[in-house]
């Protein structure tokens, strides 16, 4: 039998970064694009490329007897060598911009990750996005309060001072819509949405705008789990059921945190399917928005 490691979907096998020939092929591809004139890269899931070897079993941290795969990424040695090598062989000689999707970084290490001669030009600030999360699953997560959100913003501004700048986000393709996640229900209106947008635009750093934010997009009201395509959402739905939530409660939890909230077809106008397609879209169109009538 043959096996391969995948930290995400089974159709997304992890590459073996321990192989220097593989790393050189990656750098070759990056430089090909940089030579074409692109300005830089958004580097996804980069903290996942280094795993402690040899592979071993880890203690269960959930009721199903399994453990969160992220547990193997805690204190692996050698990650910085890979990141520095990539920087030296690709973005640095091209004077290119790079922004890293970096989770779990200790504040004392920020100077190694952002700056003129760091691994990346900037990294995304996920401090407020992960606030309230636990390893148990979405059913155990807590939505950050306005005061907690403010504290996250203040902390990030302080730790980056004199070092470099973060790339600030409210949402992206892996997050629920920010207006539904961060704003209290009474503030989920036009004024509240504009205030949230203005606030992160006024922070020091580089604001990344995700499609739909210009409309003040909110979460989609998914009628059933069948309307959700995201594999992690479906997994979390089953986990909710296993810990005792009923189907209605499980759907409520998953509908709030699902990545599909940010992946519904974009509404270009007020025609069928928002003008996104004349066919059948892979996800339902959020019924709250019809751009032609906004």
PLM regions with names:
Residues 1-294:
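Active-site and adjacent substrate-binding regions of carbohydrate-active enzymes
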């Amino acid at each position: 039998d043959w096996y391969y490691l995948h930290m995400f979907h089974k159709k997304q096998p992890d590459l073996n970064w321990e192989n220097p020939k593989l790393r050189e092929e990656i750098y070759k591809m990056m430089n090909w694009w940089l030579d074409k004139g692109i300005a830089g890269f958004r580097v996804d899931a980069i903290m996942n490329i280094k795993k402690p070897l040899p592979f071993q079993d880890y203690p269960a941290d959930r009721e199903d007897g399994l453990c969160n795969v992220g547990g193997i990424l805690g204190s692996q040695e050698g990650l910085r060598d890979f990141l520095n090598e990539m920087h030296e062989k690709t973005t640095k000689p091209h004077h290119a911009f790079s922004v890293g999707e970096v989770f779990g970084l200790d504040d004392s290490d920020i100077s190694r990750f952002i700056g003129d001669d760091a691994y990346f030009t900037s990294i995304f600030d996920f401090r407020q996005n992960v606030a309230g999360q636990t390893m148990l699953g979405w059913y155990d997560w807590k939505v950050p309060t306005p005061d907690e959100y403010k504290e996250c913003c203040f902390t990030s501004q302080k730790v980056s001072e004199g070092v470099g700048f973060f790339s600030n986000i409210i949402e992206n393709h892996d997050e629920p819509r920010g207006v539904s996640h961060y704003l209290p229900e009474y503030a989920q209106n036009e004024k509240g949405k504009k205030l949230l947008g203005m606030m992160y635009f006024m922070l020091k750093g580089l604001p990344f705008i995700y499609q739909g934010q210009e409309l003040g997009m909110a979460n989609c009201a998914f009628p059933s789990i069948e309307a959700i395509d995201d594999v992690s959402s479906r997994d979390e739905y089953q986990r909710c059921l296993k810990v005792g939530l009923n189907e209605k409660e499980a759907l409520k939890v998953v509908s709030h945190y699902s990545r599909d909230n940010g992946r519904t077809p974009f509404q270009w106008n007020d025609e069928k399917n928002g003008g996104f397609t004349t066919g059948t879209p892979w996800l339902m169109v959020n019924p709250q928005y019809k751009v032609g009538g906004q």
